[in-house]
């Protein structure tokens, strides 16, 4: 089997972002033991699953995903419920997975897509394409070459001297380029990047990078398409490093915000339609405690509600920003 080296260049932006990410990881680790914060783990895992599936057009809200994790019934299309339940099972496998094992990759895909597609946990044996409407924008590697292409990619990953930050982004791009499965490539590729990163720094186990990708979804696909056009992963590496840094900065900010009121305002600035149960889930408080915080913030003119209870949104006043 020939040796394969994915094409990319180390740009000033990649070096700068990698340095800043490493420094931010160190700062977060020094200031707080995230491994000892199970509530944060739970909240971020919910955000990861919700965001990764929302990118794939799953319509369940953050509230509904939270309810499913809590064992509650949700009124939603059954397939979308299965997608969420499967994704939680797949992410729960992270601590036991080897990022250099193709067998483990197949295990993750099986968990992620069980009951959703034929052949879950096996490489595809037919052609596959990525479409924008009716327009084909990317054709995956021909099916007969997929096993060899994946083997070469895993050999490169295990032997590369590239920094894990860069290697994880390269793998993510190459995985999506090959598109080894009939379905579920996006959600599986994003999980595998998390797996590669957590081997470098455990903090990434519960870092919801997927939430940043969802917020910048158009840019995510634009970076993939630009890399395809340029025949190099460089632009995609730069994009993903920006998303990783943004996700880390969110954690860093929360570490420095001690007041529950200010923590709530940060949440509502990021998601103005967040419901009280989800606020409570994020902050580890009861619904009653959240209502008291909201009442206090309203009295201080730091928060107001626009629209109805069902369809409205929260507006954080400018003096609170």
Language-model region placement:
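FIC/Doc superfamily catalytic core
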Residues: 1-321
């Amino acid at each position: 089997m020939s040796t394969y080296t994915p094409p990319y260049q180390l740009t000033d932006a990649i070096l700068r972002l990698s340095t800043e990410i490493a420094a931010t990881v160190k700062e977060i680790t020094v200031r707080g033991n995230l491994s000892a914060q199970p509530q944060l783990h739970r909240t971020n895992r919910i955000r990861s699953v919700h965001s990764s599936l929302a990118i794939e057009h799953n319509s369940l809200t953050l509230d509904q995903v939270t309810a499913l994790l809590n064992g509650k019934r949700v009124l939603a299309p059954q397939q979308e419920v299965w997608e969420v339940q499967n994704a939680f099972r797949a992410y729960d496998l992270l601590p036991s997975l080897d990022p250099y094992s193709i067998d483990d990759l197949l295990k993750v895909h099986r968990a992620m897509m069980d009951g959703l597609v034929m052949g879950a946990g096996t490489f595809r044996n037919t052609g596959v394409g990525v479409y924008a409407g009716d327009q084909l924008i990317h054709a995956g590697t021909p099916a007969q070459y997929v096993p060899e292409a994946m083997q070469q990619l895993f050999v490169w990953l295990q032997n590369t001297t590239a920094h894990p930050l860069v290697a994880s982004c390269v793998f993510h791009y190459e995985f999506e380029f090959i598109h080894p499965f009939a379905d579920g490539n996006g959600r599986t590729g994003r999980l595998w990047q998390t797996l590669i990163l957590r081997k470098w720094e455990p903090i990434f186990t519960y870092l919801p990078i997927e939430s940043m990708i969802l917020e910048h979804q158009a840019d995510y696909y634009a970076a993939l398409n630009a890399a395809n056009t340029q025949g190099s992963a460089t632009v995609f590496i730069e994009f993903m490093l920006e998303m990783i840094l943004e996700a880390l900065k969110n954690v860093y900010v929360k570490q420095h915000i001690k007041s529950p009121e200010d923590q709530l305002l940060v949440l509502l600035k990021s998601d103005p339609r967040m419901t009280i149960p989800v606020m409570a889930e994020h902050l580890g408080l009861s619904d009653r405690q959240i209502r008291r915080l909201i009442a206090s913030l309203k009295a201080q003119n730091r928060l107001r509600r626009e629209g109805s209870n069902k369809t409205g949104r929260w507006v954080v006043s400018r003096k609170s920003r």
